[in-house]
């Protein structure tokens, strides 16, 4: 089979218990798996298209929308083995799936900050709900030279949830 992990609103729900309606299903693939995944969806009756060559394909079938994500919108990284190896099991619509790891979800969401979309609430809720279960070493390594983005979210977390500062190690 084609390896994938579930991200988006469902992954946030799995990690935090916070439910929100979503218009689509976000599936993450290593780049080499996107074309086979798109073909499989096309064979299942979906219409598929390449949306952005460096990170995103889409599949639609009536009222069903699937994002096939294989990189970051800003082009700094692709979905790699780290996403898959640190994913964990879950159940979606009665089907066993792998859920994107919280650390990579935070890393990915650090770069989503536009006028019409900003994922800060997902980041602070992941920190609130998972706290010291987050592999902060891995997250900081993933963020790398973009550490000011993580710092801004750590500061915002402290502002929004001042009683939960212990959820973030002091060294961060």
Label every model-predicted segment.
Residues 1-172:
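Compositionally biased terminal segments of proteins
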């Amino acid at each position: 089979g084609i390896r994938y992990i579930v991200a988006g609103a469902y992954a946030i729900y799995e990690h935090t218990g916070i439910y929100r309606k979503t218009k689509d299903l976000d599936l993450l693939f290593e780049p080499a798996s996107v074309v086979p995944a798109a073909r499989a969806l096309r064979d299942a009756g979906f219409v598929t298209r390449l949306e952005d060559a460096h990170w995103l394909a889409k599949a639609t079938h009536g009222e069903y929308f699937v994002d096939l994500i294989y990189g970051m919108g800003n082009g700094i990284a692709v979905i790699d083995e780290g996403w898959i190896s640190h994913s964990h099991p879950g159940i979606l619509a009665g089907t066993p799936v792998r859920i994107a790891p919280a650390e990579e979800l935070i890393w990915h969401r650090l770069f989503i900050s536009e006028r019409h979309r900003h994922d800060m609430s997902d980041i602070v809720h992941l920190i609130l709900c998972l706290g010291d279960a987050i592999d902060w070493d891995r997250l900081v390594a993933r963020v790398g030279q973009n550490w000011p983005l993580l710092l801004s979210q750590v500061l915002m977390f402290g502002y929004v949830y001042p009683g939960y500062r212990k959820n973030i190690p002091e060294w961060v």
